[in-house]
Amino acid sequence: MKRTYQPSKLVRKRRHGFRARMSTKGGRKVIAARRAQGRKRLSA
């Protein structure tokens, strides 16, 4: 059986990166929430 997590830096950046987050309204809310929490890393 193939495992579900097949790491790829490119896919990770494209799906969960900062620019991907900023490109949607919901993503901007995610970044804002993580800023409010004081997260060291905002996105992948």
UniProtKB/Swiss-Prot annotation:
Protein name, entry field: Large ribosomal subunit protein bL34
Keywords: Ribonucleoprotein, Ribosomal protein
Family: Belongs to the bacterial ribosomal protein bL34 family.
Record's keyword annotation contains Ribonucleoprotein: yes
Composition bias, Basic residues: 10-19, 26-44
Organism per entry: Rhizobium etli (strain ATCC 51251 / DSM 11541 / JCM 21823 / NBRC 15573 / CFN 42)
GO BP terms in the entry: translation
Classification via NCBIfam families: rpmH_bact (TIGR01030)
Domain of life: Bacteria
Record's GO cellular component terms: ribonucleoprotein complex; ribosome
Molecular function GO labels: structural constituent of ribosome
Region (Disordered): 1-44
Protein encoded by which gene: rpmH
Entry-linked Gene3D superfamilies: 1.10.287.3980
InterPro entries (alphabetical): Ribosomal_bL34, Ribosomal_bL34_CS
